């Protein structure tokens, strides 16, 4: 297969589902601080890790692989509460106020879009900042519009979507997940028993050409329907968990 690796040029929009959560605000704060030279990107393979070359010398991965520069990243996303990233990070109390204040202005500028949410899939949460949609298909169309609008408003060349929200309830793999046609039909028929909000986010991202990374262990991109859609659109999907067991309780 012929490789066609394009250079990472232009602005990269990173849209996070659960952008006001502890995981997201900690990640965003660290990234903003690192790109201002106020902190090191400890734990980041792309920024700190090295590769051994044929001559035996080591070079940083970011100097070899065509990756986005930290300065080109624009953060945004969705949340079930309207707090900006600074307010949300203060509430989470993962980082100290003095550390958050180093990038306070940037954090305050990150304001969430209303989330696609269903209380039945996250029973411990009661979101107040959520989308109104008659069907899962309509919910997905709203998310697609959000992605397009964010991309245009922030002059982004490309978008990636990351799920950093709470784990949804368990649902088994069903016939609606076996093919793209069946999945789309279930979304249009508003079969809320088998179509979760996370699936709506994943579908919307893929449809808009945005890679989707799943950060929770619930059923989402690990279905034949999503694999089919990913292959059809030539858009990467990945992930199953961000070790959520260490940082939050499943809902």
Predicted regions and their residues:
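Metallocofactor- and cofactor-centric catalytic cores in central/energy metabolism, strongly enriched
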Residues: 2-208, 212, 224-228
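Glycine- and other small-residue-rich loops at beta-strand/loop junctions that grip anionic moieties
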Residues: 194, 215-219, 240-241
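Short gly/pro/ser/thr-enriched loop/turn and capping motifs at secondary-structure boundaries
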Residues: 220-222, 244-245
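Rossmann-fold dehydrogenase core element
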Residues: 229-242
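Residue-level detector of conserved catalytic or cofactor/ligand-binding positions
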Residues: 245-251
């Amino acid at each position: 297969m012929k490789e066609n690796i394009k250079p990472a040029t232009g602005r990269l929009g990173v849209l996070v589902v659960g952008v006001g959560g502890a995981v997201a605000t900690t990640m965003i704060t660290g990234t903003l601080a690192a790109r201002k030279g106020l902190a090191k990107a400890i734990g980041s393979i792309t920024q700190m890790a090295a590769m051994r070359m044929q001559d035996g010398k080591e070079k940083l991965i970011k100097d070899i692989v065509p990756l986005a520069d930290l300065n080109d990243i624009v953060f945004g996303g969705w949340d079930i509460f309207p707090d900006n990233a600074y307010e949300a990070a203060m509430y989470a109390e993962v980082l100290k106020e003095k550390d958050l204040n180093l990038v306070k202005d940037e954090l305050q500028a990150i304001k969430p879009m209303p989330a696609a949410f269903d209380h039945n899939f996250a029973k411990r949460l009661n979101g107040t900042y959520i989308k109104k949609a008659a069907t899962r298909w309509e919910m997905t169309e709203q998310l697609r519009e959000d992605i397009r609008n964010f991309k245009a408003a922030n002059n982004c060349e490309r978008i990636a979507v990351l799920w950093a929200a709470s784990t949804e309830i368990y649902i088994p793999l069903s016939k609606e997940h076996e093919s793209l046609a069946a999945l789309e039909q279930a979304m249009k028929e508003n079969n809320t028993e088998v179509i979760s909000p996370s699936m709506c986010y994943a579908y919307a991202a893929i449809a808009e050409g945005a890679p989707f990374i799943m950060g929770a262990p619930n059923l989402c991109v690990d279905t034949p329907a999503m694999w089919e859609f990913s292959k059809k659109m030539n858009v990467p999907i990945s992930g199953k968990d961000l070790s959520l067991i260490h940082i939050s309780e499943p809902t």
